[in-house]
Design a protein with these regions (language model features):
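N-terminal Rossmann-like FAD-binding beta1-loop-alpha1 element of flavoenzymes
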Residues: 7-34
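Conserved flavin/dinucleotide-binding core of flavoenzymes
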Residues: 8, 20, 102, 150, ...
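Glycine-rich FAD pyrophosphate-binding loop
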Residues: 26-51
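A short alpha-helix-loop-beta-strand transition element characteristic
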Residues: 55, 70-91, 213-219
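A conserved short coil-to-beta-strand element within the FAD-binding core of flavoproteins
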Residues: 137-151
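Flavin (primarily FAD) binding-site architecture
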Residues: 168-187
């Protein structure tokens, strides 16, 4: 495929929606090129390997039977799912001066699931369906210009690519970094900065262990807390149940602490609940997602949950050549992996 071919479709953003869209269009024999500003694919899906090889999720993790498009895609790609472990006693902390409460979570008829091997298996498998030369990492789009019968896409490295259609598969708040010529209509350009970006305010942590001592002691690993740095935590053992750990979220105030202070506060809170065995961890990592969403050199503004799936995000622009896709644009399950896939399918259906 010639990169200057005006029949080429350019997808801006190599997250789940962009990769799913490229995969769906490849089945229609449509030429696509993915431009990703980051040095990695996946967007808000990021699985790392711990020191013992444990797949640890710093981004999107869970889904359910209510997400049929994701389930169908996993089946189509030959990927396995498994239920989130929840057997045993769980902790609930109300106030710091009150003892924690223990409770049991009943086995759910519709449990949360995870992807065997880590959520990035989905990203990696989709990427393998696309020729490597048509995935450009560390390529930030700076401008999109409409010319006769095509769009010209300029990148930060000075490259200019031509396309018959361009799909913006990135959070709407980040679209304002792109210069459009002619400018987008005022109604859509005023909406874009107000759309909430999912996970932009999240801080996620993972801990890796040699053995699941909490399970051996009758605990699920689940924690809900109104005190301490960790408001929410879950068992994070792998599909084969031979690698073990925890994953959870840190409260918003943790963003002002150093990594070492965050780790110390996490371990202090958890040791009060699980005992000294919590200190025998193999690795600790956390991810401040606000660091991923940089707009004009600053972190994006945290928005309330608003304007996801807005009607103006469903329309096309620049003479039916420019489209929006992504989980924020989905009219269903916005913020979930399911929403990203639904949005991609809706765009693919227009080709």
């Amino acid at each position: 495929m010639n990169k200057n071919n005006s029949e080429n479709t350019i997808i801006i953003g190599g997250g789940l929606s962009g990769l799913t869209l490229a995969y769906l269009l490849s089945k229609k024999n449509c030429n696509t090129t993915i431009l990703e500003a980051s040095s990695r694919l996946g967007g808000r899906i990021q699985t790392i390997k711990g020191n013992l090889g444990t797949p640890l999720e710093l981004g999107a993790t869970w889904f359910s039977e209510l997400h049929p498009n994701l389930l169908n895609l996993l089946d189509e790609l030959g990927l396995k799912k498994y239920p989130q472990f929840s057997k045993g006693k769980s902790f609930f902390q109300t106030k710091s001066f009150e003892p924690p409460q223990e409770f049991f979570v009943s086995e759910s008829e519709s449990p949360s699931y995870r992807i065997a091997g880590g959520t990035f298996q989905l990203i990696d498998t989709l990427a393998q369906k696309i020729p490597k030369e048509y995935i450009k990492l560390s390529t930030k789009v700076t401008a999109i210009t409409e010319s006769e019968n095509e769009l010209q896409v300029e990148t930060s490295n000075g490259e200019v690519l031509k396309a018959s259609k361009v799909i913006l598969c990135l959070p709407p708040q980040l679209v304002s970094q792109i210069i459009f010529n002619p400018a987008l209509p005022e109604n859509i350009s005023s909406i874009l900065p107000t759309v909430q970006t999912w996970m932009a305010g999240s801080i996620k942590f993972v801990l890796e262990y040699k053995k699941p001592f909490w399970r051996e002691n009758g605990y699920s690993g689940m924690l809900y807390s109104h005190s301490g740095i960790v408001p929410e935590m879950y068992d994070h053992s792998n599909y084969e149940e031979d690698k073990f750990g925890f994953t959870g979220f840190l409260n918003g105030g943790a963003v002002s602490y150093s990594l070492e202070v965050r780790k110390e506060l996490v371990l202090r809170q958890l040791s009060e609940l699980f005992g000294s065995e919590i200190l025998n961890f193999i690795s600790y990592t956390d991810k401040i997602w606000t660091d991923e969403f940089i707009l004009n050199g600053n972190q994006i503004i945290q928005r309330p949950h608003q304007n996801n799936g807005h009607i103006l995000l469903q329309k096309s622009y620049m003479n039916d050549r420019l489209f929006f896709s992504g989980t924020e644009n989905s009219t269903q399950y916005g913020g979930y992996m399911e929403g990203a896939i639904i949005s991609a399918k809706n765009i693919a259906d227009k080709f």
